[in-house]
Regions:
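Nucleotidyltransferase catalytic core that binds NTPs
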Residues: 1-164
Length: 164
């Protein structure tokens, strides 16, 4: 929150390295583990669609109304309801550190492959990560890629600084 070029570049790398026919940006109303989002759902959907409109394989969707939830487990169950999709759940190494706090995180890892991209300053911390120790290498795929030193929180700070 907000989407940025780092998200887009990671998506392009994932499409190529995982040979994906489609990649979905599942934009949620609110992350249950974070404070209220800076931009509302409608604005984040607009920004995400605008950012990804030149990459045919990226689709931007919100499942909150369909699943009546913002929880990842409900989105994944909804996606798998009528077909045997192979789902890759993509996250940065910063999110993997707190993955054990997510609702039904072990079930998420059983329903899909967790794909992790490096974030500056986080890879060494994963040595003691609960999710890494618990799930092991068969459930988590680390993808090497160029590290993009950009963060949504820095973008929000700069936005506020120049907004006023």
């Amino acid at each position: 929150d907000p989407p940025h070029n780092g998200h887009l570049e990671i998506s392009k790398v994932a499409i190529k390295k995982l040979k994906l026919s489609e990649l979905i940006w599942a934009v949620t109303k609110k992350n249950p583990l974070k404070k209220d989002p800076y931009f509302n759902l409608k604005k984040r959907l607009f920004l995400s669609k605008n950012m990804t409109n030149r990459v045919n394989k990226i689709k931007v969707k919100s499942y909150d109304k369909l699943t009546k939830s913002s929880r990842t487990i409900n989105v994944i169950k909804y996606m798998k309801r009528n077909n045997d999709l192979k789902i890759y759940f993509i996250m940065g190494s910063d999110n993997l550190l707190n993955f054990h706090k997510w609702s039904e995180w072990r079930k998420i890892a059983n329903l899909c492959k967790i794909v992790v991209f490096p974030r500056t300053g986080y890879m060494k911390k994963l040595i003691n990560c609960i999710a890494v120790k618990s799930l092991g290498a068969e459930k988590i795929l680390f993808i090497r890629s160029k590290r993009i030193n950009i963060s949504s929180s820095k973008i929000r700070k700069n936005y506020l600084k120049y907004k006023y």
